[in-house]
Amino acid sequence: MATSKILLYYAFTPLSDPKAVQLWQRELCESLNLRGRILISTHGINGTVGGDIDDCKAYIKKTREYPGFNRMQFKWSEGGADDFPKLSVKVRDEIVAFGAPDELKVDENGVVGGGVHLKPQQVNELVEARGDEVVFFDGRNAMEAQIGKFKDAVVPDVETTHDFIAEIESGKYDDLKDKPVVTYCTGGIRCEILSSLMINRGFKEVYQIDGGIVRYGEQFGNKGLWEGSLYVFDKRMHMEFGEDYKEVGHCIHCDTPTNKFEHCLNEDDCRELVLMCPDCFANVETRHCKRERCAAIAADFAEQGIDPLVTS
């Protein structure tokens, strides 16, 4: 039986014809039976694809033949094509939607004016040298940080990357502008952009972790400064860096430690992802996001003895 894997990758490089790159990438992925999501813009490419390991290796080889992608780094993760519903290859104004396509500048070396890149070991060395002066700044959506983050990290109150500019311009973080700020995200791409946006807004000493949380976790597992699970945007929904991880998330109903996000049972107008322990998710009466309307719907199902997950 063939072994399957997931690839995570990105490259910031000027692309004069994103549409041509889109057509080439779609044809390449289809020929290798890969599924996943790829975004392309004039700034570069951002992708996550899964499939048989030999097909993934062939994809890496072919993709690196393109001049702008010849130095692109690929991160391997557990999973495969089945973790994605289909193959999606799209052209967008941005490969990460911060809402600042005209502010971001890239050249053949990547993002212009971004934060200083630190290897995982250098992150630890910075903390050892500067202590509590160092601030970890989460570059992900606030929901992702519920199940894992760097120790004592600042977690901005954002639902999407589009919210970051208003958040950092709000004045909430002005006290960090003279401190060493280490931005981090899943694989590094969001912080390539976020760090440059922060520098443009007066943050004087900004860093980013090479390869993001994934690279840091691969090197240090659960023995470093990372705590908990890593949220991922596929069917797995979370991954860990070894079996000795700590569950830092808590069920919204009973406060039991959990790293499992579940959808609210109100399928018509909610379906919000919230943290629920197995027991509370199994109980129809508590399988909701705690909004009043959703709680009422759950109570109605429970009273009628109906479980929406049980098919006849």
From Swiss-Prot:
CDD domains assigned to the protein according to its UniProt record, in alphabetical order: RHOD_YceA (cd01518)
Regions annotated as coiled coil: none
PANTHER family: THIOSULFATE SULFURTRANSFERASE/RHODANESE-LIKE DOMAIN-CONTAINING PROTEIN 2, THIOSULFATE SULFURTRANSFERASE_RHODANESE-LIKE DOMAIN-CONTAINING PROTEIN 2
Gene Ontology molecular function terms on file: oxidoreductase activity, acting on paired donors, with incorporation or reduction of molecular oxygen
Organism: Corynebacterium glutamicum (strain R)
Example GO biological process: tRNA modification
InterPro entries in UniProt: Rhodanese-like_dom, Rhodanese-like_dom_sf, Rhodanese_C, TrhO, TRHO_N
Family: Belongs to the TrhO family.
Keywords, ordered alphabetically: Oxidoreductase, tRNA processing
Pfam families: Rhodanese (PF00581), Rhodanese_C (PF12368), UPF0176_N (PF17773)
Catalysed conversion reaction: uridine(34) in tRNA + AH2 + O2 = 5-hydroxyuridine(34) in tRNA + A + H2O
Catalytic residues identified in the record: 185 (cysteine persulfide intermediate)
Chain's role: Catalyzes oxygen-dependent 5-hydroxyuridine (ho5U) modification at position 34 in tRNAs.
EC number in record: 1.14.-.-
Tree of life domain: Bacteria
The protein's enzyme class: oxidoreductase
Gene from which the chain derives: trhO
Name of the featured protein: tRNA uridine(34) hydroxylase
Rhodanese domain ranges (all copies): 130-225
